[in-house]
Every structure is written in structure tokens, then in C-alpha cells.
Amino acid sequence: MAARRPSQRLAAYLASPSTRFPRTQFASTGRWLSSSAGPKASRTSYFNYSPLWLAAVALGTVAPLAYKMAEMEPINADPSTLADRDAQKKRESGVNEDSPMRLRMEKFIREQQALIVAELERVDGKKFRKDEWERPNGGGGTTCVLQEGNVFEKAGLGVSVVYGSLPKPAIEKMRANHKTIDPSMESIDFFAAGLSMVLHPYNPMAPTVHLNYRYFETANPDGTSQAWWFGGGCDLTPSYLFDEDAIHFHKTIKAACDAHDKDYYPRFKKWCDEYFYNKHRGEARGIGGIFFDDLDETERDRENTFSFVQDCLKAFLPSYIPIIEKRKDMPYTEAEKDWQQLRRGKYVEFNLVHDRGTAFGLNTPGSRVESILMSLPLTAGWKYMHEPEPKSREQRLVDVLRDPKEWV
């Protein structure tokens, strides 16, 4: 008779009555799978087994299961942080009108950054350097900088997205302006996203311009929104004042504001004049624009406020591009360039001494310092006890900065 394989010999051996192992009777009582909340249904099973038979069954069952588990994709546990949840949402469904506002705002400012960069590259003729960066605890951004271009001595546009946790003292401080923040929590997850931009042209006849629009949100433990608010604005800082430029800039911004609320422009223009003010110099940084902060549910619902912010940001290109196109190639003297440097020095003073956004960024753990200081000009100057000549163009600018004007 042909030799049997080892598996056949093992089966015959286990089946043979002459094979004697200590046998054990095994009884089990359990409940069948059921959605019923009633008493357990009993079932009793009796198995006569030998140790060798049990080992064979175990090996045959566990080995394929272990192999299958090794092949399977790892099971993803629920994301533990707000940043993880948002990253998962973007992977699974992208960003659309039903997405959380924080993701919609991030998408919008990234799109606007790309549009503005493309238009400024058209005006200047040179390309921006673009740096993508990430924060260790979630978030990141894109910093676009053009230095020593044809039109812009320095131009920077930065998108920043920050996830973090507010400690108890910060919660109590913020709750003064936002009552929907839960004061009982020891810490609260937060999200902040914004687009910041500063353009410093070479030509002293062309004005510096600044823009910032941002969104802040605190979140419940399940990731839903708790408190939210928008902030932002834009403003013009000329070295030489052309009334027609100031009127065009303010008129364009006013139109965006008026489409939502007729009170917005006068209110936010006044706020801008007061905020961008060098207290130690006794003069405004520039000729203003609009500025607002903490726009939350006490003003308008979130959708309407988001729409307002979108319109303001979209108004930037039509408010500034006609001005830079008109002024970028005007002739100027060395003395006029020196005056521009002195005005830039005042700009630097405000940003480093008074600006809350700069202070917030520099004091946020894990922040990107290069992006925060992107707003500073490539060159600036200071002279001891310098005063412009009476009745000069330089003096007229200082007069307006000391007594802000209504342009529209």
C-alpha cells in the first residue's frame, strides 16, 4: 500500500479507538447574539476532545486569522484632536458649502492668495518665492515673498492656519467679548486662519498697502463650533499723498461694505484710524481704510459675516492695482526716496510696538517667525529729530496723518 501523507496518518491516528488520551467533557453556556433585552437563552454543548486534537484545531484557526490581520489595513481610531478631525474630513469629502466654517475660510483665503500672487506677478514681472510649512500640532500655511522685484522692493502674502488649546486664563479673558465660550472648561481647542499681505513698492510715489482677514473659532470636545468671530481690514500707507488715489481706495472698500451694511464703512474706517495709530509719534501709520475685529453672532449670523469678509477681500485688487499701475514708473529724486525710507521707519515702529497681530504671532508657541515678520520692509531709515520742510508735500502728508481725513 502506498505510503500515506503525514496529515492522513494524523487523521487516522486521532480517529482510532486505540488511541488513548485523557478525555475531558467540556460544557459551555452562553447567549446567542440578539438585540433582545430579555433573559439569556441557554445553550449547552459537550465536546470530547484530546489535547492533540485541540492543538490542531487551534493552529488551523489562529494561523489564517493572524495572516489575514497582517494583510488588513490598520483600523483608524477616532481622531483625537480638532486638527486630526479636520484633516480626515478634507481627505474623505473635501471642502464644500456643508463643511465647517473653519475649513471653508481656509479654502477661501488660499484661493485668494493664489489669485493675488498671480496678479502681482503680472504687474512686477518676477515670480514670488513660495514656502509651504506645517505646524507640529496641526495647521501650517503658505508664505509667498517677492524681494527686489521690478516694482516691489518687498511683497509678502502669507496664509496661516493654527490649531491649539487655550488655557484657563485665556478662556476667561476671551469670554469678556464672547459669552458663548464655556467658562467651566480647563482648556478649549481653538482654530485660527488668516491671510496677511504687505506690499512695499520701490517707487516712493507708489503707496504701501496692508491687508489682513482672519477667522477664529473655539470648539467643543466633539469638534463642533462653540464661539466664532471674524476680523480684518486693509489700509493704505503712502509716502506722497495723491488725493485721487486715496479717494479711489476708500470708495472701492466702501462699496464692498455698503453691500452688507451702510454703517460698516464709517464705523470700520474710524476703527482703522484709531487702531493704526503710532501713539508715541502722535500720528496715524497711513491714510486708513477699514479695520474690524470680533464680528460674531451679536452682529450677524456666520454666513452673512463670511460673505462680508469675502467681498472685502475680493475688493483688494480693484482697489489697489489701478494705483500701483499709475505710480510705479513715475520719476522721483533721491530726496524723495530718503523720505520714503523715513516713512517706512514709522511703519516698522507701529508693527513692532503696537500691532496686536504681530504680538499674538510672536507669543504663540510653534509660530513661524519669518512669516510674522514678513510685513517689514526690506529697507527703512531713521534720522534724529527730522522734520519736513513747512508747506512741502512731505509736510502735507504729516498733517493728514495727525488729523485723519474723510475721503468719501
Language-model-derived ranges and their functions:
Residues 1-61, 71:
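N-terminal mitochondrial targeting presequence
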Residues 67-98:
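Membrane-proximal, acidic/low-complexity disordered segments on the non-cytosolic side
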Residues 97-181, 298-333, 337-353:
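Gly/Pro-rich turn-and-neighbor structural signature
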Residues 143-232:
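Internal mixed beta-strand/loop scaffold within catalytic domains of large alpha/beta enzymes
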Residues 158, 162-191, 237-241, 281, ...:
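Mature, function-bearing regions of proteins
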Residues 225-331:
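Long, contiguous internal "core" modules enriched in hydrophobic/ aromatic residues
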Residues 269, 273-291, 325-371:
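An amphipathic alpha-helical core segment
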Residues 358, 363-408:
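TerminUS-proximal long segments
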